[in-house]
Amino acid sequence: MILKANKELKQKYHKCEEITNFKQMLDRSAEIYKTRIAFKLKDKEGKIYDKTYEELKQDVTALGTSLIECGLLNKRIAVIGKNSYKWAISYLAASIVGIVVPIDKELHSDDVINFMNVSESKCILGDNKNLKKINENIEKLENKETLFIDFDSKIQEGNLLSFEIQMEKGKNLVEEGNTDFDKIIVNPDELKILLFTSGTTGNAKGVCLSQRNICSNILSIYGIVKVKRSDLFFSILPIH
């Protein structure tokens, strides 16, 4: 019976191209599915618009180039906020440029700052609502030179940067021939994601993950769940 069950299970596995890091995944997706829809988004008026795989790669490259220009290559970069396209490309860009530190938006401001301090994050990207949590107790933040990249802000002042302006700067740099982001070679086995546990059984702990860890999970799921090009995915739980 066990042998029969194993044979039946093996027949359900689907083949998938091997990927070991996010940069490889982005490059291959943009190459293979160039004009296909990667994200469906809502604008401020509630109208649906699309982002193709090529546009996704361009946006991650622009943001990544901007982060490098800010001196964040190989640094720890936090991301906080609700599920959004900006959150997604921030996570991808940060994990390629440095080490991404995703922080739960439901945490109290003290916990957010504690994770920032413990992780030694040099920058945090997020929406205005969640960045305010840090400003409430900014004196507790150990790194006084931390960069804040606000998804919603239109202005830049001191360490407060506008996501929109930084994206535009990144795009301009790429158009001018900057290839710093493209030159990055991702080691799939290095620490690239620092994820904090909920701490329900004690103090929260930092979990060190590589991009190979995440990619192997993606491939394992694809092995048993056949995904077609026409399939759409709706995200409810926090992306990280």
Ranges and model annotations:
Residues T65, L107-N137, N217-F234:
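Conserved ATP-dependent adenylate/AMP-binding module captured primarily in the ANL superfamily
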Residues D50-E54, I185, K192-S216:
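Conserved AMP-binding A3 loop
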Residues M1-K51, E55-C70, K75-R76, L92, ...:
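N-lobe entry segment of adenylate-forming
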Residues K47-D50, G64-L107, I236:
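Conserved AMP-binding/adenylate-forming
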Residues K34-I37, K171-F196, N203, K226-L232:
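Conserved pre-ATP/AMP-binding loop-to-beta segment of ANL
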Residues K57-T65, P188, V207-K228, I236:
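Conserved structural elements of the adenylate-forming
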Residues E45, K132-P188:
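ANL superfamily adenylate-forming
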